[in-house]
Amino acid sequence: MSSKPKPIEIIGAPFSKGQPRGGVEKGPAALRKAGLVEKLKETEYNVRDHGDLAFVDVPNDSPFQIVKNPRSVGKANEQLAAVVAETQKNGTISVVLGGDHSMAIGSISGHARVHPDLCVIWVDAHTDINTPLTTSSGNLHGQPVAFLLKELKGKFPDVPGFSWVTPCISAKDIVYIGLRDVDPGEHYIIKTLGIKYFSMTEVDKLGIGKVMEETFSYLLGRKKRPIHLSFDVDGLDPVFTPATGTPVVGGLSYREGLYITEEIYKTGLLSGLDIMEVNPTLGKTPEEVTRTVNTAVALTLSCFGTKREGNHKPETDYLKPPK
């Protein structure tokens, strides 16, 4: 790490219209209530909380074909992109608290305006790469990557609310980790475009250590560049993050999640982070909500240097009694 790391700006994105379930807009508040901001301030980073973005309802937001709430999702992402771009311009790491994963469109678009050479690590049970034509649900939280990829430009009609979006990443700039629920159309896209992925099968076969090694070699082998980590908490097994909208059994363990974030921290290249799909209203018990939120907090802290082996302040001699 450089002697003084970049500051962090926390941006709340309390948005739920990329999917049908209420409650995910309460994610940012739940993460803050669990002490995320205070705990981040205990790290080596300077932390500023931008607060939550205020999203206004778009009236008469009728579906586009089967795509639901297109104008609301498009407008909210446009707002988020502007704030993230401003944050990045100031040399700050953007930390977006979701909110549903459709907000990655704005988060990554805004980040790429300032760092067009960025790469994306997408941790998720799902690829979120359905297009408005391949989606069977019409929910935009299953489509953000399709809007971001240059190779899919022109492969689906213009969706109202998204005229501002310019695809900003190539198929070779993204790696998926944790996949285990991929639609046929999505599978066709990732195979056809040659997108690098580590489904749970690869995680089982290689182990998470090798997965991260290969991820970095693939994305950073030729040139070091900024990393955008987009982390859907459903990437982890529902044992650890039950309070989320689309849980899928057989996911990453708590330990594997922390290993991913510890390794990303060690590169010194993390430049943008999304912590998405925490839905405090979906836990079957209060304990399930707490477990999900605390896991999301732990993953975030790990991105900024909190290690399982422990931490100590470099300038302190802990064997000297305090005066």
From Swiss-Prot:
Its cofactor is Mn(2+). Changing residue 141 to A/C/D: Strongly reduced catalytic activity. Minor effect on affinity for arginine. It is found in: Cytoplasm; Cytoplasmic granule. One of its GO terms (cellular component) is mitochondrial outer membrane. Substrate binds at residues 126-130, 137-139, 183, 246, 277. It catalyses: L-arginine + H2O = urea + L-ornithine. Induction: By arginine or homoarginine. Pathway: Nitrogen metabolism; urea cycle; L-ornithine and urea from L-arginine: step 1/1. The keyword Protein biosynthesis does not apply. Detected in liver (at protein level). Inactivated by diethyl pyrocarbonate (DEPC). Belongs to the arginase family. Key element of the urea cycle converting L-arginine to urea and L-ornithine, which is further metabolized into metabolites proline and polyamides that drive collagen synthesis and bioenergetic pathways critical for cell proliferation, respectively; the urea cycle takes place primarily in the liver and, to a lesser extent, in the kidneys. This is Arginase-1. It comes from Rattus norvegicus (Rat). The gene is Arg1.
